[in-house]
């Protein structure tokens, strides 16, 4: 899968760095998302766990070419959103 990242114009670095997220963590979530749903304006939202156990929300847009996407941002789930995600995952596992 070809993954491109939005780069912060001020630094030239991937925007995800502003949220202390690495490219590898984003790839972990995108390869095995716990949830993947429609976002705004054609974007998609993937929620999932990294190999080391962090739960992330990744906002991305599928590219026109197959097996390619553009990551806008990603950040760690905390508080109520994290609790709700874990609850949904437990319920999904009980089915």
How should these model regions be labeled?
Residues 1-95:
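Ribonuclease/tRNase effector modules and their secretory precursors
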């Amino acid at each position: 899968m070809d993954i491109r990242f939005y780069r912060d114009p001020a630094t030239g670095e991937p925007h995800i760095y502003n949220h202390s997220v690495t490219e590898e963590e984003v790839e972990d979530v995108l390869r095995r998302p716990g949830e993947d749903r429609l976002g705004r304006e054609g974007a998609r939202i993937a929620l999932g766990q990294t190999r080391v156990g962090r739960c992330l929300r990744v906002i991305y847009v599928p590219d026109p070419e197959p097996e390619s996407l553009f990551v806008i941002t990603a950040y760690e789930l905390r508080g109520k959103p994290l609790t709700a995600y874990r609850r949904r995952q437990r319920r999904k596992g009980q089915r």
